[in-house]
């Protein structure tokens, strides 16, 4: 992997990530045109730069990223836009840096959630429900789901797209630091 490749991806990804962050913060939605378009662009850039091996690398990284958010998506703790954005960023990052990328995104997600909890911008009802669904076999899931604020309520959702963007930038910066 060359230094030019990392700089190219950083320059290419930055405006796209800023656009998705703004969309997620304002409307708590990540548009399909941005997420699926980003996934296609990531695979195209990987294959254009590295050929078939790059395409395979990007595709595997995207699949691992989808698998990473699959359980949170299934228990409704993450949205489909988050899954698609993570897959797109994984396609750009590539297989080699995927573990670092997923750890950076997780840590950034924790920081964003704590920040929003401290500023009282988000409620803990969804988080409590998710943990009780996972770890408490006696928990009444129907009653718990009824206590969660509606999905369109601003306080019910954390803009995880911001955490994905921060984790992507952190991974690219780590990659740049390792090359110098």
Regions found by a protein language model. Give the residues of each.
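A membrane-topology feature that recognizes alpha-helical transmembrane segments
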Residues: 1-180
């Amino acid at each position: 992997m060359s230094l030019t490749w990392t700089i190219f991806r950083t320059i290419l990804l930055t405006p796209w990530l800023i656009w998705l962050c703004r969309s997620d913060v304002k409307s708590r939605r990540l548009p399909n045109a941005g997420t699926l378009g980003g996934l296609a662009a990531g695979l195209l850039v990987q294959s254009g730069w590295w050929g078939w091996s790059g395409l395979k690398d990007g595709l595997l990284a995207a699949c691992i990223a989808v698998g990473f958010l699959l359980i949170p998506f299934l228990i409704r703790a993450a949205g489909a836009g988050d899954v698609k954005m993570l897959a797109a960023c994984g396609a750009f990052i590539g297989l080699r840096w995927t573990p670092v990328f997923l750890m950076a995104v997780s840590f950034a997600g924790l920081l964003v959630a704590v920040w929003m909890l401290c500023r009282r911008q988000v409620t803990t009802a969804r988080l409590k429900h998710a943990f009780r669904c996972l770890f408490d076999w006696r928990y009444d899931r129907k009653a718990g789901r009824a206590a969660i604020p509606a999905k369109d309520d601003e306080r019910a959702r954390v803009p995880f797209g911001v955490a994905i963007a921060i984790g992507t930038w952190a991974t690219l910066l780590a990659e740049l630091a390792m090359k110098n």
